[in-house]
Amino acid sequence: ESFFNFCALTLEKYKSNEKIMQINGSFHLSQFKSFDESYYFSKLNSCWGWATWKRAWEMFDADMIGYEESRDRGEIDKYYENRQISNWMISYLEEANSPSCGIWSTQWSYSILKNNGLCINPTFNLVNNIGFFDAPTSGIHESFSSYSDYMLENFSHIEHPDEIQYDVSNDVLEFKNIIQLTDPRLLNKGLINFIKRAIKTVLNLFHER
C-alpha cells in the first residue's frame, strides 16, 4: 500500500516534468546513508517495482536507435558521470542491442539515458521481489536475491526535495555497495583480475630468481 501511495503522490507531482521518467520502489542504502527527504533523483532504474507515465513510456526505444553513436561519442559516460557505472551499463546495453535479444528493462534504461532522464528513488524500501522464492530465475537475478526481502517500510508523510538535483554520489554508493558485490559479471571480472594479478606476481617472483 505504501508503494502505491508513494507512486500516486510522485506521479501527480511530476506528471508534466519530462525529465523525470521513472519511480523506483526499492531502497538498499539504509545502512550506508541517511536522507532528510523521502526520495532522491537517480540515473539507475530498477525493475523490481516501479511506475512511470504514459508520456515517458512513449519514449521507450526497443530498437535502441543511435546506441553505437551515443556510446562512441562518450555520451553514456557523460550521462552516468562515473566510468565504472557507465562501463557496467554498456556491458548490458551491448547485449540488449543484439537483434535476437529482448531485454526490455535494459532497453528501457537506454531510453531513459537517451533522453537524459532521471528516476525517483525512495529513501525507504517499498517493495520486495517475491519471484526469487516461487519461480525459476536467471543467474543475474539470483545474485541479487539477498536484497529481495528487505524489510518493507511505511511512511505517513512525504518530504519532497527542494529542487530537482542529481547527486552522482548516491548512485556510486549503490553501485559500490550493492551492484558491484552482487552482479555476476562484475564478480567474474573481479575474479579474473585477481587471477591475473596472482599469475603476474608468481611470474615476477620466478624471474627474480
Regions flagged by a language model, labelled:
Residues 2-209:
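An acidic/histidine-cluster motif and surrounding catalytic segment
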